[in-house]
């Protein structure tokens, strides 16, 4: 499974990248707002830090303007991935951009039907929103499972990018079901390493080691 970090915070991205935990980055208009930076400037900096795909989202909702904004975003770096909403105009733009060799991340996916259309349009990634579905009382993981089955049935190459991930359990369940990628906030990715028994065991080992009076280096 690949891990993408869902943030536009360059400091956080650099830290996780140095740990070897980042395969890519996803951003959206809300994260750009939170960063307080210019979208082109911050996205270019992120692309220089991370070797994998960096998703940057268009703000337009109509095809013609989507294509204009996509052209600007595509020039930022070779590892850029153009993010589009799963709408009719978005699917049309996806088909045009993917046919031209661009990576495309179709976002705001809440149904298996939307994921099927995105795959047919040539999307590189489909981003089903787990947490937001959970908020409505629907199990977001069921959507991941449905998409996995459909893509396997027809050998679609579009990768399932589990998004709106809020907990370490979301990450585990997405991995068990077979999502290709999980994108999560920095805090969630860091929390994956934590377990109380690990902390307790380390505390015991360190206390016992101190009693030996030895040094390794």
From Swiss-Prot:
Matches recorded under InterPro entries: Aldolase_TIM, TAL/FSA, Transaldolase_3B, Transaldolase_3B/F6P_aldolase, Transaldolase_AS, TSA/FSA_arc/bac
GO MF term set: aldehyde-lyase activity; transaldolase activity
CDD domains cross-referenced by the UniProt entry: Transaldolase_FSA
Species name: Brucella anthropi (strain ATCC 49188 / DSM 6882 / CCUG 24695 / JCM 21032 / LMG 3331 / NBRC 15819 / NCTC 12168 / Alc 37) (Ochrobactrum anthropi)
Example of a GO biological process term: pentose-phosphate shunt
Class of this enzyme: transferase
SUPFAM superfamilies given in the database record: Aldolase
Annotated compartments: Cytoplasm
Claim: Cytoplasm is one of the keywords in the record: yes
UniProt pathway: Carbohydrate degradation; pentose phosphate pathway; D-glyceraldehyde 3-phosphate and beta-D-fructose 6-phosphate from D-ribose 5-phosphate and D-xylulose 5-phosphate (non-oxidative stage): step 2/3
EC code: 2.2.1.2
Record family assignment: Belongs to the transaldolase family. Type 3B subfamily.
Reported function: Transaldolase is important for the balance of metabolites in the pentose-phosphate pathway.
Coiled coil: none
GO cellular component: cytoplasm
Database matches in HAMAP family: Transaldolase_3b
Protein's recorded name: Probable transaldolase
Catalytic activity annotation: D-sedoheptulose 7-phosphate + D-glyceraldehyde 3-phosphate = D-erythrose 4-phosphate + beta-D-fructose 6-phosphate
Catalytic residue positions: 83 (schiff-base intermediate with substrate)
Keywords for this protein: Cytoplasm, Pentose shunt, Schiff base, Transferase
